[in-house]
A protein has these predicted regions:
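FAD-site-proximal beta/loop scaffold in flavoenzymes
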Residues: 7-83, 179-182
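Rhodanese-like catalytic fold shared by cysteine-dependent sulfurtransferases
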Residues: 191-201, 205, 212-230, 235-242, ...
């Protein structure tokens, strides 16, 4: 990459220039603006009589918070444009708002998100709780099977679903779209549990990745799954904990290894009173080991979410 100052070697170049509303021509029109966007109400009307605005130039609102939100997406433009057309013809329809839903295809993986992040949820007055899972994207024995890494955020008090982020080689958009449906209907984790989602080995797992993550989050909320998130671990929350390798085979250098299938009582070398951090490849075996250790009196265990 050659600039006016020097040349830079790179393995990959990402052009992320961003966009901005092209509304300079509206200066002096009397339209109420905010940072170059046209402010509208739920019907798509501006502050000027009989003038509507839609698309990348128009500000809409967030469906969860009700606050103004800029969503320069083709989907938003088409949905709000159709609504405005109906309102011009006499309807009185209100736009329900956006969730910041997005999907992106990267080399070898896909990324998607919708709703609030954990940080945004806290700023909006929710009591957020989240979980990170690593789950199969289809039956593990089926050709082309891979994994999703999913983060799900909900309000701890009401159990309302607030957001989802997912990355993986498979169809992340389906996980995102299920979450969008739940969030737009103000659904709780209880409302969305045990849904009869499409299943066949080429397409999904018997318990859908979305439902699997929801179940894990409910276990965490109900105190059945004691964890550190990767963020908590990075901030030093696991200081003073003994790391225990719970992988299928020994995989963590310097950490004592415990084979889940052999635990039938207290584990030699592990004090039931000490703080123990259980780590495996994806978090599942560590969770199963945590349950066994709890049964045998180990009450100070944590699992590293996501492995």
């Amino acid at each position: 990459v050659i600039t006016n100052k020097k040349a830079y070697k790179a393995d990959m170049v990402i052009l992320s220039a961003g966009i901005r509303p092209n509304t300079a021509f509206l200066e002096g029109s009397g339209l109420e603006m905010f940072k170059g966007t046209i402010l509208t109400n739920e019907q798509g009307e501006t502050n000027l009589s009989d003038i509507y605005a839609a698309g990348d130039c128009a500000m809409v609102h967030n469906a969860i918070t009700g606050k103004p939100a800029w969503s320069p997406m083709g989907s938003t433009a088409n949905i709000s444009g159709r609504l405005i057309a109906q309102n011009i013809m006499g309807a009185k329809l209100g736009y329900r708002g956006v969730l910041g839903t997005a999907v992106c295809k990267l080399p070898g993986m896909n990324v998607g998100r919708t709703g609030l992040t954990e940080e945004q949820a806290a700023l909006e007055g929710f009591h957020p709780v989240s979980v990170i899972t690593v789950v199969d994207d289809k039956a593990h024995y089926f050709p082309g099977a891979g994994s999703f890494v999913i983060k799900m955020i909900a309000d701890r008090d009401s159990l309302r679903l607030l957001g989802v982020q997912v990355i993986g080689a498979g169809g992340v958009d389906k996980v995102v779209d299920i979450a969008v449906t739940g969030i737009m209907l103000k659904g709780t984790l209880t409302d969305l549990a045990d849904m009869d989602l499409a299943y066949a080995p080429p397409f999904s797992t018997a318990i859908h990745p979305f439902e699997h993550t929801l179940n894990v989050l409910m276990n965490k909320i109900n105190g059945k799954f004691d964890t550190f998130t990767p963020a908590e671990y990075a901030q030093g929350a696991a200081e003073g904990y003994k790391v225990v390798d719970a992988c299928l085979t020994p995989s963590i250098a310097g950490a004592p290894y415990v084979d889940l299938t052999t635990v039938e009582g207290p584990v030699e070398g592990l004090d039931p009173e000490e703080k123990i951090l259980l780590v495996c490849n994806k978090g599942k075996r560590a969770y199963l080991l945590q349950n066994r250790l709890k049964f045998y009196g180990y009450q100070n265990t944590k699992v590293l979410e996501g492995g």
